[in-house]
Amino acid sequence: MLKRLLIAACTLLFAGSLLAATPAAKPHVLIATSLGEIEVELDPAKAPISVKNFLEYVDSGYYDGTLFHRVIPGFMVQTGGFSAGMQEKKTRAPIKNEADNGLLNERGTLAMARTGVVDSATSQFFINLTDNDFLNHGARDFGYAVFGKVVRGMGVVDQIAKVPTTRRNGFADVPSDDVVILSAKRL
């Protein structure tokens, strides 16, 4: 009897240590757009700051009603900073650039958009339409931090990439007809 209890206790301890060693689940977010749904998987193990930042914007409803404001076929589609009429949305403080995390700017990945200042990313992000090696860390500068990937709805992303664009309010590559994030929610 004592032997069985000892075996059961050891088994429980071993199972507990296995569970503790299991990496945290990768959060999924459903981005419902005016052209369809895009499901993304985030990588908090490799991009903890970017993922935390993105999820804070998602959870607050910040992305709801946000435009895809920069669409460049064969390159990327960008969103996260403007509402209807190209009105710039207020953001939180910039975050540290995690482009040195080993994740690459490959087709279907999400990366933080930024200015020429390395640590200037806030709410804007883009989805790569192709492998954009020149955006990777060290390719030409610090790079652009990848923090997730599209797991469903890449056809919607490709559809966004095909919309006609124009200049609007001093911005180039803006869709002629608004492409809008209707909602972004954790799954």
From Swiss-Prot:
Q: What gene codes for this chain? A: ppiA
Concerning Gene3D superfamilies, the annotation shows:
Cyclophilin-like
Q: What does this protein do?
A: PPIases accelerate the folding of proteins. It catalyzes the cis-trans isomerization of proline imidic peptide bonds in oligopeptides. This protein is not essential for growth. Presumably plays a role in signal transduction.
Broad EC category: isomerase
GO terms under biological process: protein folding
What the entry lists under InterPro entries is as follows: Cyclophilin-like_dom_sf (IPR029000), Cyclophilin-type_PPIase_CS (IPR020892), Cyclophilin-type_PPIase_dom (IPR002130), E_coli_cyclophilin_A-like (IPR044665)
Q: Please tell me whether the keyword Isomerase is annotated for this protein.
A: yes
SUPFAM superfamilies, per the entry = Cyclophilin-like
Q: What coarse category fits the chief subcellular location reported for this protein?
A: periplasm
Could you give one GO CC term from the UniProt record?
Answer: periplasmic space
Keyword field contains Zinc-finger: no
The protein in question is named: Peptidyl-prolyl cis-trans isomerase A
Residue ranges of domain PPIase cyclophilin-type in the record: 25-186
MF terms per GO, please?
A: peptidyl-prolyl cis-trans isomerase activity
Q: What is its EC number?
A: 5.2.1.8
Cysteine pairs bridged by disulfides in the record: none
